[in-house]
Regions:
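A generic structural motif
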Residues: 165, 194-202, 266-268
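Conserved SAM/AdoMet-binding glycine-rich loop
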Residues: 14-165, 169-173
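Canonical Radical SAM [4Fe-4S] cluster-binding loop centered on the CxxxCxxC motif
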Residues: 1-7, 47
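Conserved, mostly hydrophobic/aromatic
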Residues: 9, 123, 151, 197, ...
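Structural recognition of alpha->loop->beta junctions
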Residues: 107-120, 184-198, 204
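Radical SAM enzyme [4Fe-4S]-AdoMet core and its adjacent flexible, acidic
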Residues: 40-69, 135-136, 141-142, 188, ...
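Catalytic cores of alpha/beta
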Residues: 104, 172-189
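Radical SAM enzyme core and accessory elements
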Residues: 204-300
Length: 300
């Protein structure tokens, strides 16, 4: 995979603008790591990625270049091409990288929200449990919470009403029922439940699959919890969509097994109603057109 120069992208935008039938909208520039597109440091430019460390985990590498100016200038150049009406970033951004930019991060967020979000912005926190995020090799949840706050503040200041669409995954190696419950409580607190639940699926050649296969973290060879059986995977997946009537019995089972019966009942601090089998007050009929505060499509 190779990055493209600004000149190459602008040249293609000009070709698109002259293409018959083109409506003036470019729907994505940069892919899912759009703002983290340049080599991370001088060492990566010469010899590729480091074999013994990651750029952002467990702490940002001191050699890491954090700068959004080149990407921001590229977006400005593309949207200034005659015939281009809108340039969107729809695959998502690396929010943890953005939050490290103390000099230009706010300017980037301003232009991102004002010019490049069509109403919803996809991001991939993947989980909120720091234990699971550590297994994933990702920044802790505090980075995502700071990003959420900045996104909300920027929207308010610019008079916009945009939504975050976070991607979460269940049953990743390292995740227990306690971690899945922590994620469910986060979803309830933020008012967002995903319409689709993504379960971990092992794929060859990945660190996570090595964990899944061996039950060990290859980085330190310590045991790591793994949800292998279909039952536990179903329980964790149900907690991602805790408010669906069809998941009620699984959510109750998960809470009781984890010793969290305190979350069963009615009220703001509860996860699932103790009402009848039809679902109680925690379960509502789906209404697809009314957005949730954080961008879901099912109101609470």
């Amino acid at each position: 995979m190779r990055g493209r120069t600004r000149e190459s992208l602008v040249r293609e935008a000009r070709v698109l603008a002259r293409t018959e039938g083109f409506k003036g909208y470019i729907h994505d520039v940069g892919g899912p790591t759009a703002n983290f597109r340049a080599p991370a440091c001088a060492l990566q430019e010469k010899g590729g990625a480091c074999a013994d460390r990651e750029c952002l985990h467990p702490e940002p590498c001191p050699r890491l270049r954090v700068d959004h100016r080149e990407y921001l200038d590229t977006l400005r150049a593309i949207r200034s091409v005659p015939g281009i009406k809108k340039v969107f970033i729809r695959s998502g951004i690396r929010f943890d990288y953005l939050m490290l930019d103390e000099t230009g991060g706010r300017d980037f967020m301003d232009e991102l929200c004002e010019f490049h979000v069509s109403g919803q912005l996809k991001v991939a926190p993947e989980h909120v449990s720091d234990r699971v995020l550590e297994a994933m090799g990702k920044s802790g949840n505090a980075a995502y919470e700071r990003f959420r706050g900045l996104f909300k503040e920027t929207n308010g200041r610019l008079g916009l009403k945009q939504y975050l669409i976070p991607y979460f995954i269940s049953s990743h190696p390292g995740s227990t029922l306690d971690d899945a419950i922590e994620l469910a409580l986060h979803l309830k607190r933020t008012g967002f439940v995903p319409d689709q639940a993504q379960d971990f699926y092992p794929t060859p050649g990945t660190l996570a699959t090595a964990m899944y296969r061996t039950g060990l973290d290859p980085r330190d060879m310590k045991p790591i919890p793994v949800a292998r059986g279909e039952r536990e995977k179903r329980l964790q997946r149900a907690l991602l969509q805790y408010d669906r009537p069809e998941n009620r019995s699984l959510v109750l089972e998960a809470l009781r097994e984890a010793g969290r019966a305190d979350l069963i009942g009615d009220g703001p601090g509860k996860l699932v109603s103790s009402g009848n089998a039809e679902g109680g007050r925690n379960f509502r009929v789906r209404q697809k057109k009314e957005p949730r505060p954080e961008g879901g499509s099912r109101p609470r």
